[in-house]
């Protein structure tokens, strides 16, 4: 049975809650001792992982809609992408304000250039910014065929963001490896699409 438009609306409500509730938890953890002895790193990793989760969820929508024969699921993709950008922005902000500090923001540019994993992170964020700014129907009409070409660049983020995570951890743990593996699996589902590009 296919999902109805009303069911998709309720699904969107649930997805908005999924995007907002982690923020409430983070505020609670900050104010009630729910973080470790290095709360700055905890906040950075939490916001980054949440952004990655929404990125993976965004990439999951198309194959899930196709294989489950639920075309209306596509309507949730933009919402998931926007939450991915929100959490990626919180991740970047947590680094700029908590790691560097508001008085050292002038160092941000040099830090992004001198540390390769940060370079990958800011490239990913800039791509997400471009996709967010052009995610409206107005932008889609204005850009025409170029809109899809631009939004295919999300696959670059699917490569760079997990590498950014893997590179940023001092001790390799299963978690970043799992995220990288999931991203590769979701890209592999698009093998035919990529193959057509290279013909």
Curated annotation (Swiss-Prot):
One of its GO terms (molecular function) is oxidoreductase activity, acting on diphenols and related substances as donors. Coiled coil: none annotated. GO terms for cellular component: plasma membrane. It is a multi-pass membrane protein. Keywords: Cell inner membrane, Cell membrane, Electron transport, Flavoprotein, FMN, Heme, Iron, Membrane, Metal-binding, Transmembrane, Transmembrane helix, Transport. The keyword Ribonucleoprotein does not apply. The keyword Transit peptide does not apply. It comes from the Bacteria. Binds 1 FMN per subunit. Binds 1 heme b (iron(II)-protoporphyrin IX) group per subunit. The chain crosses the membrane at residues 10-30, 82-102, 116-136, 153-173. One of its GO terms (biological process) is protein repair. It is found in: Cell inner membrane. Its main location: membrane. Its cofactor is FMN; heme b. Part of the MsrPQ system that repairs oxidized periplasmic proteins containing methionine sulfoxide residues (Met-O), using respiratory chain electrons. Thus protects these proteins from oxidative-stress damage caused by reactive species of oxygen and chlorine generated by the host defense mechanisms. MsrPQ is essential for the maintenance of envelope integrity under bleach stress, rescuing a wide series of structurally unrelated periplasmic proteins from methionine oxidation, including the primary periplasmic chaperone SurA and the lipoprotein Pal. Heterodimer of a catalytic subunit (MsrP) and a heme-binding subunit (MsrQ). This is Protein-methionine-sulfoxide reductase heme-binding subunit MsrQ.
């Amino acid at each position: 049975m296919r999902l109805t438009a009303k069911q998709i609306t309720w699904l969107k409500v649930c997805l908005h809650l999924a995007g907002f509730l982690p923020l409430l938890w983070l505020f609670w953890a900050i104010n009630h001792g729910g973080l470790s002895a290095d709360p700055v790193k905890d906040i950075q990793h939490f916001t980054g992982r949440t952004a990655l989760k929404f990125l993976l969820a965004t990439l999951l929508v198309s194959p899930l809609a196709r294989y489950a024969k639920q075309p209306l699921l596509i309507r949730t993709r933009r919402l998931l992408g926007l939450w991915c950008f929100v959490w990626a922005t919180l991740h970047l902000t947590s680094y700029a304000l908590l790691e560097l500090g508001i008085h050292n923001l002038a160092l941000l540019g040099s830090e992004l250039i001198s540390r390769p994993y940060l370079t990958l992170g800011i490239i990913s964020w800039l791509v997400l910014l471009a996709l967010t700014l052009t995610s409206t129907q107005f932008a889609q009409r204005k850009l025409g065929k170029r809109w899809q070409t631009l939004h295919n660049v999300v696959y670059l983020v699917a490569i760079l963001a997990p590498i950014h995570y893997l590179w940023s951890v001092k001790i390799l743990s299963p978690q970043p490896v799992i995220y990288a593996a999931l991203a590769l699996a979701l890209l592999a589902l698009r093998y035919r699409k990529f193959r057509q590009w290279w013909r």
